[in-house]
Amino acid sequence: MNLEARSKQFLAAPIAIFVSCSLFLIPAKSQEKPRLKVVELDTHGKDYLQVLAGPPESVTMKSGLEVLAPNQSVGKHSTGQHEELLVVLEGRGVMTFDDGSKLDVKANHALYCPPETEHNVTNTGSNVLRYVYVVASTK
């Protein structure tokens, strides 16, 4: 078999595999369209309120309202394969990262965390810290 014939044979296999695999991906796109939703941001004395729970309420977004008492922290966690946005409604605190860096958290500020970022939010003020977080999948 000459070089040109072997090249064509070699290229045919990956193309056939790609076509075959792409057929399995088609049904995953049949998710029902999410509906409009309004959520009152009142925790009724609780420290957490789920705003969006992910599919089928949204395409990839999850969201919640956190309320931290003075000196309370949400706990160290990673964004994983998600982006995260925090919108601070009330209070002040600090967001700490594994590398030792810190960001001030205060009312009327929004903070963005990229994927694969370990962080923690702690209330450093004398009143409650209230913020809404929104996470969206990057995959």
What are these regions (language model features)?
Residues 2-15:
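Bacterial N-terminal signal peptides that target proteins for export
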Residues 18-62, 70, 75-76, 96, ...:
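A short, N-terminal "cap"/entry segment at the start of jelly-roll beta-barrel domains
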Residues 56-58, 81, 100, 126-127, ...:
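Short strand-connecting beta-turns/loops that link adjacent beta-strands
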Residues 60-63, 83, 116:
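Extracytoplasmic
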Residues 77-79, 119:
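Histidine-centered divalent metal-coordination motifs
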Residues 115-139:
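Ligand-binding loop in jelly-roll beta-barrel domains
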